[in-house]
């Protein structure tokens, strides 16, 4: 439980941070949420701050062609129609997908969402010759859809997306491409003085301005953005999906990266909802009538190992030893039960689990035996360095968790050094890879990962095509077997084929242990009893449009 002195200090800090809020923002029409991010995620279409950005700026402000079903929490979230009502791979060309668009959907500025708008939005991240090309949005986008190569208008309500190779996973991938209003952006671009510079300079300025005047087609509209302080969203009463017209008039999003500060904000009723409460504060939070929501998520909290020459993790005995030395059940207890033990990317019961030969469990004696075989001992420990963050999307409680791992691995002849940086910086460095100067002296990185589908959960960590900066194979791990199996997954265009291919890839991945498999998050959040209608899906995301707030 939080000590009273710490809580009092946090309360004072929070009261100061919230002094800019008006009394009206505490009424029943306004939902106030404290995020783990240190800044407001980008609002210009392609969010940063990991999937907390998609959760709080992408999904509320925008729509995608294909979206996640966040309406229930009894089973894993699947994809459902968004701006596209249907899609299929071209039977004559498996590198071409056809999407039929939903009729009569309008952006917040009243203009239509049509095929031209979709092509324009693909151009913002792919077409270097287009005025709207936004290099600053590429890193948050293309690593999540690396095979996408272009878009073609077939007619006003039909668009084709092309890929560099057959890719059965594209519908999952494009849940990350949020569609902004071309007309709104072009008006801003036209107003940028030519004296600003060339097309690229004017475009950059236009996107900067657009961030505070964002226009999408989502259930919420942007009212006010104050970087590092707050984002105010307002209800889109004309939203096309009547089941998702928001129940509250406004949402105020506040960045509060420190868990104790978030807890203090909740207990002092400065906010209605906090992400990732501190585990030692959960009993105190519950005792004051707040509710803890949690559910299984397609999430992995790992250490991702470097496979560069000179990295100690190239020795599979070392990789296996680290995985066998960690008591995940004890860590779960330490976190108040708010995690699931990771024995792979996918657990028993998941159709993509397969049948790994190597069993990840707590077996410190075998771990020490492996380390001894590898040449290490209590008097000659292995020095390893992991990079992590103090907070961030999906990072759970990164500092206490890494400190626990540090102490645990010490008993198996590991000497762990922890390097801490700001979340967005760590996330950027993750995409740059282990060869980048930012990774100097680091041989493992702790970045939580969404594992919604076989690309996100496996392919982007196990193939040469996913080497940085294309995707997030930070450690440059690959084997001929994972390459072959990843190709089979991409060519699996039926559910049965996908389950078989993905299961075989997962078994191979676990057997090669490119990660320290630690935990799966359950996404705990603490919410005021005045807030109702919360659906905690089995997802990284949540639908704010379903939420109500009473007096």
What is each residue range found by the language model?
Residues 220, 309, 337-374, 390-401:
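Structural transition elements
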């Amino acid at each position: 439980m939080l000590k009273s002195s710490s809580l009092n200090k946090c309360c004072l800090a929070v009261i100061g941070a919230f002094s800019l809020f008006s009394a009206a923002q505490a009424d029943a029409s306004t939902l106030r949420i404290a995020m783990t991010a240190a800044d407001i995620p980008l609002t210009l279409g392609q969010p940063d701050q990991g999937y907390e950005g998609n959760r709080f700026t992408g999904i509320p402000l925008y729509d995608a062609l294909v979206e996640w079903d966040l309406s229930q929490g009894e089973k894993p979230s699947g994809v459902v129609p968004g701006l596209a009502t249907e899609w299929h791979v071209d039977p004559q060309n498996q590198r071409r997908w056809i999407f039929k668009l939903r009729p009569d959907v309008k952006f917040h500025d009243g203009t239509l969402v049509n095929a031209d708008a979709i092509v324009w939005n693909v151009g913002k991240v792919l077409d270097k010759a287009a005025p709207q090309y936004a290099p600053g949005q590429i890193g948050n986008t293309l690593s999540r859809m690396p095979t996408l190569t272009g878009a073609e208008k077939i007619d006003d309500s039909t668009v084709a997306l092309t890929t560099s190779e057959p890719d059965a996973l594209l519908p999952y991938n494009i849940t990350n491409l949020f569609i902004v209003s071309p007309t709104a952006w072009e008006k801003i671009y036209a107003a940028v003085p030519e004296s600003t510079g060339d097309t690229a300079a004017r475009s950059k300025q236009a996107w900067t301005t657009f961030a505070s005047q964002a226009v999408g087609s989502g259930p919420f509209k942007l009212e006010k953005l104050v970087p590092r302080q707050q984002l105010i969203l307002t209800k889109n009463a004309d939203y096309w999906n009547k089941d998702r017209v928001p129940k509250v008039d406004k949402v105020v999003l506040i960045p509060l990266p420190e868990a104790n500060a978030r807890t203090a904000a909740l207990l002092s009723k400065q906010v209605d909802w906090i992400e990732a409460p501190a585990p030692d504060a959960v009993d105190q939070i519950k005792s004051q009538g707040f509710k803890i929501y949690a559910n299984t998520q397609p999430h992995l909290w790992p250490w991702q190992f470097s496979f560069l020459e000179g990295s100690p993790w190239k020795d599979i005995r070392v990789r296996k030893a680290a995985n066998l030395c960690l008591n995940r059940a004890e860590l779960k207890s330490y976190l108040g039960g708010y995690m699931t033990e990771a024995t792979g990317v996918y657990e028993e019961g998941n159709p993509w689990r397969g049948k790994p030969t190597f069993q990840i469990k707590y077996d410190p004696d075998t771990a020490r035996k492996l380390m001894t075989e590898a040449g290490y001992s209590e008097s000659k420990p292995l020095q390893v360095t992991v990079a992590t963050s103090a907070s961030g999307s999906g990072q759970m409680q990164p500092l206490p968790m890494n400190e626990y791992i540090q102490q645990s691995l010490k008993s198996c002849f590991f000497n762990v050094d922890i390097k801490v940086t700001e979340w967005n910086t760590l996330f950027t460095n993750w995409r740059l890879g282990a060869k980048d100067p930012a990774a100097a002296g680091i041989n493992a990185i702790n970045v939580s990962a969404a594992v919604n589908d076989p690309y996100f959960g496996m392919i982007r960590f196990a193939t040469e095509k996913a080497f940085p900066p294309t995707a997030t194979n930070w450690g440059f791990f690959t084997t001929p077997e994972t390459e072959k199996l990843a190709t089979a997954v991409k060519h699996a265009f039926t559910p049965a084929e996908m389950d078989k291919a993905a299961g075989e890839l997962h078994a191979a991945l676990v057997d090669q242990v490119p990660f320290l498999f630690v935990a799966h998050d359950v996404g705990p959040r603490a919410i005021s009893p005045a807030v109702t209608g919360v659906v905690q899906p089995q997802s990284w995301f949540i639908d704010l449009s379903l939420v109500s707030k009473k007096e």
